[in-house]
A protein has these predicted regions:
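N-terminal pre-catalytic "stem/leader" segment of glycosyltransferase-like enzymes
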Residues: 1-49
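Catalytic phosphate/metal-binding cores of nucleic-acid and nucleotide-processing enzymes, i.e., regions
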Residues: 26-28, 60, 77, 132, ...
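Active-site proximal beta-strand in glycosyltransferases
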Residues: 38-43, 53-71, 89-91
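Membrane-proximal helix-turn-helix segments that form the acceptor-binding/catalytic region
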Residues: 71-90
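Donor nucleotide-sugar binding/catalytic pocket of nucleotide-sugar-dependent glycosyltransferases
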Residues: 88-102, 106-126
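A short helix/loop element that forms part of the nucleotide-sugar donor recognition site in Leloir-type
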Residues: 122-138
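Conserved donor-binding/catalytic core segment of Leloir-type glycosyltransferases
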Residues: 139-154
Length: 154
């Protein structure tokens, strides 16, 4: 079975997810949508880039990364429902997104966190951690968690 993962080509995390999927999926991917059994809308907002005849004839999985309920407008709902006609199942990374979209679709929803590419994300070596704590005046006993992202929410 071959999966075509749609990269939105925005130089963002979804493009990296597509590249990593293609690199590490053990040959279960195709970069040719004609050969695909499944179309994975990894950047679901870019779904209109796929010809409707492909969306109609193939299995379609859409990833919904997050929804901010206060920003989910009537137009957002119309767009969701337009895409929903072609989607067979949804992938979401968290329960909150599943809870939200379960109210507007009857399609299967799979809650699966994203993977971590250990080739680019790894623990900081102790000597570097100590230097950073000193440089940024962080307590040596504290457990620190960092988030590094380009955020669409500002």
């Amino acid at each position: 079975m071959k999966v075509f993962a749609l990269a939105p080509n925005e130089n963002w995390i979804c493009d990296r997810f597509c590249n990593e999927w293609n690199q590490f999926s053990n040959g279960e991917y195709t970069e040719n949508i004609h050969e695909a059994d499944i179309i994975w809308l990894l950047g679901a907002w870019a779904w209109r880039a796929v010809p409707l005849d492909y969306l109609s004839k193939k299995k379609v999985v859409a990833t919904i990364h997050h929804i901010t309920p206060s920003k989910f407008t009537k137009e957002s709902l119309r767009e969701f429902l337009s895409r929903d006609r072609y989607v067979d199942a949804y992938h979401v990374p968290c329960q909150q997104t599943s809870d939200f979209i379960s109210k507007i679709t009857n399609k299967d929803i799979y809650v699966i966190p994203f993977w971590v590419n250990q080739n680019i994300w790894a623990p900081t070596p102790e000597k570097d951690a100590a230097k950073n704590r000193e440089k940024y005046n962080l307590p040596t006993e504290a457990f620190l968690v960092g988030s590094f992202q380009r955020d669409t929410e500002g």
